[in-house]
Amino acid sequence: MNSSIKDYITVTLNYWVFTFTDGALRIIVLLHFYKEGFSPFTIALLFLSYEFAGVFTNLIGGWLSTNYGIKRILGIGLVIQSLGLSCLSVVNTDWGAVIATVWILFCQGLCGVAKDFTKTASKSAIKLTSDKLEGFESKDSRLFRWVAWFTGSKNAMKGIGFLGGGLLLTVFGFQNSLWLMVFLIVLIFIYTMTQLPELFGKKKASRTIKSFFSKNKVVNNLALIRIFLFGARDVWFVVALPVFLYSSGWTFVQVSGLMAFWTIFYGFIQAVAPKIIPETELRGIGKRLRNWMLGL
């Protein structure tokens, strides 16, 4: 097997497993603590440290991957995720609302750091392995296809994680579910560390963090738009919808199943995007962005 293909498969499997635990954790935290009496507003606050830690980590993740190697950053992400899950498993609402909330915020922050370490390193690996392959299609087209499939499959796996989280919480309860996910993280950590080259993705010349910010105004505008797009989605999808459904009498599995279906569906759309947008239209895709946005 081509070494680039092998590395791509390893990174993808790593990210799939991590994303499964990330999706499962979201639904487990939300439903468990709502059942324990936390208000919807407090639950929303629990995700603040997760998101803010992720934003900060995302800024430096690419720089760290380049300077220290993708393999190391993937490993660090998995270790931090297992630490966050382990710490969260000991939380007890008998500690009092303030102490329990602060502890959960700390654990969620760890998981947010882990998510963006793993995400940034994985996407860097996809670009690296894509650049090494040769074929009939252009480099840009190949990268577009690989990233689309990778991102789509990631979101599909997150949807499976939502459903898995509901099932785990129903069958095993809060603490045991978290420990099962730690065990899964340990397994994929061992696999990743034994399969990827030691210096995978490490560059000889060190680059400054500033160099990773795009000088292209269009890219920066898209990044800004993406923040508001995700914010508009998360307002209703992350907390409001599942809390409303659960308070309306839905079970853990029913709530997580609906969220899973929705996430898997849009992951599928992402994965087939290269089929929807022909290679000949890639260079002019920016001009069609306004029409796509109006359609959405």
Regions found by a protein language model. Give the residues of each.
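C-terminal ends and interior cores of transmembrane alpha-helices
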Residues: V79-A97, L296
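Primarily marks hydrophobic transmembrane alpha-helices of the MFS/SLC 12-helix fold
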Residues: L74, G286-M293
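Central cavity-lining transmembrane alpha-helices of secondary-active solute carriers
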Residues: L45-W63, A260-A273
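Symmetry-related core transmembrane helices of the 12-TM Major Facilitator Superfamily/SLC fold
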Residues: N176-T194
